[in-house]
Amino acid sequence: MAHDLEVVEEKITVTERRHSVIEAPEIGRLIEALSRRGYEVFGPTVRDGAIVYDRIESAVGLPRGWTDEQEPGRYRLKRRQDEALFGYVVGPQSLKRYLHPPEVRLFSAEKQNGTFRILNNETKPQRPFAFLGVRACELEAVAVQDRVLLEDKYLDPIYRQRRSGAFVVAVQCTLAAKTCFCASMGTGPRARAGFDLALTELVGEGGHRFVVEAGSERGAEVIGELQSVPATDTDLQKAEAAVDAAARQQVRAIDTAGIKELLYQNFDHPRWDDVAGRCLSCANCTMVCPTCFCTTVEDVTDVTGEHAERWRRWDSCFTLGFSYIHGGNVRNSSKARYRQWMTHKLASWMDQFGRSGCVGCGRCITWCPAGIDITEEVRAIREGQDHGKP
């Protein structure tokens, strides 16, 4: 299979999409089919007390029978009463870790005869990626990063190399965590685009099956290699009902009406002081956020000074050094840094990229050690917005 496929594959229109049903054992054969086609397959697995993306070669490593419990500042795994393969919501990782990695060596240099010789480093993966278990909010996050790193004025060649030709197997959410709010953001829980295949897991008296939707021609080709039967109207109704139930389970929401103007008009709201008293500026929220894209560049040398490397690493607007310029730091308080992050995510992102930078995954709530809840911060500002006006 060619490794230089364009990022945007030819998709099947909604009216042409084909639905089929496969039994649970076919998931292992799906992984094998993707491997045969030359993909390096990544999927969910349990590691260090969390469900994370990692390289998989079979269905054995999937989180069978596990679910997650999430609340502000809390994440725990627990056993389910069934053998669901995807019976969880989201872990701390997203596809950002693979498409826009935490660190990448840009180039290295060696000193020879008194001068440095630049050595370019290969940043393109040896095989294209295939991702299994991608949620609707994560698909939306990839679309956001595409807009930022591929479609903006400055194209990121490293992101393009890693994004190109990626095969995406989405999994429709059939349950929600207490920190999810994708329904209010219009980003889930149903995946509607951006996938090659979408699975809806049905576990119950009817057995353990998956309703499969082909979102691209190559997705349909892969399903053709598996044992499947056409989905009936009853199958489709059950799948739709399961996803609708996940939307109803969500207990958090952001009222997005006029949110850009709301935040722009409330720079001096007392809530910013309140949240600053709780924020640790640890940058957890930006590390787990699937859309945050800020990086820094560092040059390192060995002790002899004969070898040097330039690395690009994730950075965060919560660190003091991020906003340091000649003469001082323009955001030297937790108040200023949190306000910058939330206002950018929910307001100025729209001016830059034409859409919100938040997909409602709830990771910033779950993984904040102080339990700060972005939905509550927005609500507090909206309810007391007169305080922020001059």
Label each PLM-derived region with a short phrase.
Residues A2-Y264, H269-W272, V303:
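Iron-sulfur-associated redox domains of electron-transfer enzymes in respiratory
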Residues E26-L30, C285, R313, D373:
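General structural feature for long, well-ordered alpha-helical segments within catalytic domains
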Residues R37, C282, C361:
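Single, functionally critical "micro-switch" positions that shape active/binding sites
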Residues E40, C285, C364:
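Residue-level detector of anion-binding/catalytic polar loops
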Residues V142, P290-C294, P369:
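Active-site-flanking alpha-helical
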Residues T256-G277, T295-P390:
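Ferredoxin-type iron-sulfur electron-transfer modules in oxidoreductases and energy-metabolism complexes
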Residues A276-T286:
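Extended amphipathic alpha-helical segments enriched in small hydrophobics
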Residues N284-V300:
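A donor-sugar binding/catalytic signature common to diverse glycosyltransferases
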